[in-house]
């Protein structure tokens, strides 16, 4: 009974955190909508966004969501090798996504499309960057679970952490789908 209460408290706390993150991203999307409505972003978006590259980023992140979902399924089956596999797969897919995002930022800055050039670039870098920071912390979360799994084995506490991580990771995917649709697709199409 006490363990179930602790689990529910941790999940409730995570949901509160995720809802506060929703508010942050909602504000960022509102600012983006205001800025893009006052400026012809079509000229910028057609020149700077490589939709196939961003689609590959999206595909990688969605695959990481799939591996995270498989991790959640496996957490109760006590097969630690499979749990390691899905944690590492999710980590490397997330890292690939993050490196692609950093590469995209680097190319934009080389093309003189930095945040200091225009408000559009400022909000673009902010939205994508805030999402990237969340992915980075998700990767740290994976590393901490791997460390704990190595030293403690699979415990109820680790199962709860895996569930919390998976909820967080799926949240990041939902936010990225919004970024992809609202920022990239809306500007290019």
Swiss-Prot record:
Residue intervals on the Extracellular side: 32-52, 103-122, 183-189
Q: Which InterPro entries match?
A: Cyt_c/ubiquinol_Oxase_su3, Cyt_c_oxidase-like_su3, Cyt_c_oxidase_su3-like_sf, Cyt_c_oxidase_su3_a-hlx, Cyt_c_ubiqinol_oxidase_su3
Where, by residue number, does the polypeptide cross the bilayer? 11-31, 53-73, 82-102, 123-143, 162-182
Query: Which segments sit on the Cytoplasmic face?
Result: 1-10, 74-81, 144-161
Q: Which Pfam families match?
A: COX3
One GO CC term on file: plasma membrane
Record's subcellular location: Cell membrane
Q: List the disulfide bonds.
A: none
Specify the protein's topology with respect to the membrane: Multi-pass membrane protein
Its biological purpose: Cytochrome bo(3) ubiquinol terminal oxidase is the component of the aerobic respiratory chain of E.coli that predominates when cells are grown at high aeration. Has proton pump activity across the membrane in addition to electron transfer, pumping 2 protons/electron.
Q: Which family does it belong to?
A: Belongs to the cytochrome c oxidase subunit 3 family.
Q: Which NCBIfam families match?
A: CyoC (TIGR02842)
Q: What is this protein called?
A: Cytochrome bo(3) ubiquinol oxidase subunit 3
Please name the source species. Buchnera aphidicola subsp. Schizaphis graminum (strain Sg)
Query: What gene does the UniProt entry assign to this protein?
Result: cyoC
């Amino acid at each position: 009974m006490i363990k179930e209460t602790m689990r529910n408290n941790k999940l409730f706390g995570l949901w509160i955190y995720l809802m506060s993150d929703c508010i942050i991203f909602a504000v960022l999307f509102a600012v983006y909508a205001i800025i893009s409505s006052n400026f012809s972003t079509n000229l910028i978006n057609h020149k700077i966004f490589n939709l196939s590259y961003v689609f590959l980023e999206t595909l990688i992140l969605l695959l990481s969501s799939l591996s995270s979902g498989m991790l959640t399924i496996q957490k109760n089956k006590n097969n630690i090798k499979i749990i390691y596999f899905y944690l590492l797969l999710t980590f490397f897919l997330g890292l690939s996504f993050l490196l692609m995002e950093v590469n995209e930022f680097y190319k934009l800055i080389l093309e003189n499309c930095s945040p200091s050039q225009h408000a559009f670039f400022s909000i673009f870098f902010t939205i994508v960057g805030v999402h990237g920071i969340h992915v980075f912390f998700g990767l740290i979360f994976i590393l901490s679970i791997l460390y704990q799994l190595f030293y403690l084995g699979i415990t109820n506490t680790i199962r709860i952490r895996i569930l919390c991580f998976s909820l967080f990771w799926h949240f990041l995917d939902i936010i990225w789908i919004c970024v992809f649709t609202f920022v990239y697709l809306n500007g290019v199409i």
